[in-house]
């Protein structure tokens, strides 16, 4: 059977998609890039917030149109939306032939076989309690780079978030298992591993009180052929001195940290159940900049949380201005069904949320531009990912994470190989991107 995929949401979901693709290929199916050629399509959904749910449902309904044209026979909804709503999705969307949760994505082949025999399938567990995935993956990332999901689930209880109720409690993967997967990825030509989880810094907390992340990073650093290790989704509360030391002293661990702070007002952070305050964030950032040379910091902030007054927004704005993050993502609070924050008083109007988000993003745009301008006339190692034209390639430096940050456009008269590193002279800036030359 020809099977196509639509993968929505975060990088963790992308990894699940890659595991499902490999499992189906192993079972004898063909993975196709064109949905028009597919007999069956799997839409791997996101159920984190309402806009993501709406995008997922829209993708399912749009794909269902292919069934009416006769080119598509079967349609499966997988991922967080399916895990969250289960059989309700089957009832609401009659075009669906199956709903598949997140508890064991490598078992997708059995579900596909049941659907092919005419059964409508709902395959979910109430709350996943184990981490099952140990199989191979078909990579969907650009050459040279891959995500490594080190754990599943989350033990935090942020008041705006429903992920623990969907993905379950924290389940860390064994270090040997991760090292084996990393070795497989290196054999496929991977040179950068991007470590992801719901909470990367909490890796190992379900096994012992101490984070096992420093040990994992040191072991990964011993692998021949691996050049970059990048850390994403670090919680400010668990960023220990041991983690900082590894980032500072292990050459393969990039001086790049993605630390979503969500807010800088102690009042709002308390309402969010983040368990740290403004003072903790200031101390953390000062320590990081003092101990890690050439550090790149990325963060995420939320605007319009219930009870966010002008003074709270002003505190966040001032904090962003002072902290000088290299990259920043911003999104407006959504009162998510099932979250504690949805029931809080003093909900903020959408117009005010949008205004505050726009102000923060305009501030960050100026900061990022100034930081990029300061990089002109420096030389950086660039991982080449694609080619735009005969003399123009696209890649990333250590200070640019895949999918979320800017890129580096490389001008050259040479033929560069995708997935290779080259030393590039940075000569200009275009929006959020760098312009470089390779001679």
Curated annotation (Swiss-Prot):
It is an enzyme of class 2 (transferase). Residues 140-370 form the Radical SAM core domain. It is found in: Cytoplasm. Its main location: cytoplasm. Its cofactor is [4Fe-4S] cluster. GO terms for biological process: tRNA modification. Keywords: 4Fe-4S, Cytoplasm, Iron, Iron-sulfur, Metal-binding, S-adenosyl-L-methionine, Transferase. [4Fe-4S] cluster 2 binds at residues 154, 158, 161. One of its GO terms (molecular function) is protein methylthiotransferase activity. It catalyses: L-aspartate(89)-[ribosomal protein uS12]-hydrogen + (sulfur carrier)-SH + AH2 + 2 S-adenosyl-L-methionine = 3-methylsulfanyl-L-aspartate(89)-[ribosomal protein uS12]-hydrogen + (sulfur carrier)-H + 5'-deoxyadenosine + L-methionine + A + S-adenosyl-L-homocysteine + 2 H(+). Residues 1-117 form the MTTase N-terminal domain. NCBIfam families: 30S ribosomal protein S12 methylthiotransferase RimO, MiaB/RimO family radical SAM methylthiotransferase. PANTHER family: RIBOSOMAL PROTEIN S12 METHYLTHIOTRANSFERASE RIMO, RIBOSOMAL PROTEIN US12 METHYLTHIOTRANSFERASE RIMO. This is Ribosomal protein uS12 methylthiotransferase RimO.
């Amino acid at each position: 059977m020809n099977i196509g995929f639509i993968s929505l949401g975060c990088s963790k979901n992308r990894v699940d998609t890659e595991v499902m693709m490999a499992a189906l290929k192993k079972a004898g199916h063909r993975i196709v890039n064109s949905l028009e050629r597919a007999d069956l399509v799997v839409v791997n959904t996101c159920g984190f917030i309402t806009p993501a749910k709406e995008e997922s449902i829209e993708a399912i309904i749009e794909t269902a149109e292919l069934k009416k044209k006769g080119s598509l026979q079967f349609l499966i909804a997988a991922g967080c939306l399916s895990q969250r709503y289960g059989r309700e999705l089957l009832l609401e969307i009659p075009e669906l032939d199956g709903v598949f949760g997140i508890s064991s994505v490598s078992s997708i082949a059995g579900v596909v076989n049941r659907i092919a025999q005419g059964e409508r399938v709902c395959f979910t567990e109430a709350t996943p309690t184990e981490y099952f995935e140990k199989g191979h993956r078909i990579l969907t990332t650009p050459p040279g780079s891959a995500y490594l999901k080190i754990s599943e689930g989350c033990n935090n209880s942020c008041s705006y978030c429903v992920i623990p109720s969907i993905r379950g409690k924290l389940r860390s993967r064994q270090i040997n298992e991760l090292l084996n997967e990393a070795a497989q990825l290196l054999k496929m030509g991977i040179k950068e591993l991007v470590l992801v989880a719901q909470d990367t810094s909490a890796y190992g907390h379900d096994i012992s009180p101490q984070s096992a992340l420093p040990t994992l990073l040191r072991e990964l650093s011993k692998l021949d052929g691996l050049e970059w290790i990048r850390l994403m989704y670090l919680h400010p509360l668990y960023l220990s001195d041991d983690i900082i030391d590894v980032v500072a002293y292990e050459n393969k661990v990039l001086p790049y940290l993605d630390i979503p702070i969500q807010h800088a007002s102690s009042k709002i952070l308390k309402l969010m159940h983040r368990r740290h305050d403004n003072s903790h964030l200031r101390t953390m950032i000062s320590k990081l900049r003092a101990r890690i040379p050439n550090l790149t910091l990325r963060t995420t902030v939320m605007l319009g949380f219930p009870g966010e007054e002008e003074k709270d927004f002003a505190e966040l704005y001032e904090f962003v201005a002072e902290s000088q993050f290299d990259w920043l993502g911003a999104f407006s609070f959504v009162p998510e069904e099932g979250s504690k924050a949805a029931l809080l008083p003093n909900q903020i109007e959408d117009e005010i949320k949008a205004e505050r988000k726009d102000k923060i993003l305009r501030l960050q745009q100026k900061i990022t531009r100034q930081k990029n301008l300061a990089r002109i006339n420096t030389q950086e190692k660039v991982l080449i990912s694609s080619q735009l034209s005969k003399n123009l390639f696209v890649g990333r430096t250590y200070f640019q994470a895949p999918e979320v940050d800017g890129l580096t456009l490389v001008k050259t008269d040479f033929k560069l190989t995708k997935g290779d590193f080259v030393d590039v002279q940075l000569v200009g800036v275009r929006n959020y991107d760098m312009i470089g030359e390779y001679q």
